[in-house]
């Protein structure tokens, strides 16, 4: 079940629904993750939104530019683009899987094909919770290993 405070966050930021519908109507998944989910649950206002998607950065850039949005690649190695609207900064990152060598804190990154793999790489706090705005107002997604 989605907390009413998270639903309120989405309702107060119609841009999130528009963005989510744009991705879904073009065959892509898009999930709100990270601090925005936390802030929505805790009823804290935010204008910083992170999403994860199965669209590659190139697919996201093409989709967004076709619909007159301005984008910047901010983390090529991490599959992240930044999107601006009039009041929000949005980061959209392709699903990914991180692996670590025993002697390094820097991850080796590869694209993942599903949400659960992406969530499983995140720390096991609120950052591993995802919310699909376009698909369901009824539940949050957690990695199965939590």
Regions found by a protein language model. Give the residues of each.
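Catalytic cores of the polymerase beta-like nucleotidyltransferase superfamily
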Residues: 1-140, 146
